[in-house]
Amino acid sequence: IRAVTRTAESITAGDLGDPWTPTQGAATWRDGVLKATTDSPDCRRLLDALYADDLFGASGGARAVAALDDAMDQAQLRYQVLALNAADVDRTLAWLQSLPRTCGTFTAVTAHGAVQNVEVKEADLPQAGDARQGLRVTLRGQTPDGDPTVLTMDVAAVRVGGDTIAVTHGGMGDVWADATRAAVQTGVQRLSEIRRSGRVEV
């Protein structure tokens, strides 16, 4: 039976390079913007998944987790490796793929009563793993003082054999898609190497 350490399966700040560092805690925009609701069940499920950093539901236990900060652009990236049933993963990938059509644009209301105009688009991912889906979600609103706000979230899910990678990457400033793609590419390579080697790490 193959066993691997969480470190072996995960990615690190070094994989993404400067300015990424280990996280200093949850960003304030998570509660201020992502804790929101809307009428459509599919769109509400998306908001809930983004808020919880959980694309696959509470039953999905993460074997490896990396949480990283980009202090320069005030962005955060969360990378998870999960052991899930392939059919369940494919159903979630199909749901994610449908969202640019079913939730392309919609309005959400935060816990503080602020209105967010949400846009969901498909995002390109590396041709890595057995199946994959990426999204870019943009939430536009205003501060209580009337200043415009924009929260951008990249979402990526990739099935790699019996493993699944989930990445969320967001912030109120620039959110570079290259970092999302690098996390996916590095993660798939790492899992593939571990599976090929079949070695046990303790």
Positions of the model-derived regions?
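Short C-terminal domain-edge/linker segments immediately following a structured domain
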Residues: D53, V109-V115, A166-G171, G187-R190, ...
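Sec/Tat-exported extracytoplasmic proteins
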Residues: G14-W20, Q24, L96, P100-T107, ...
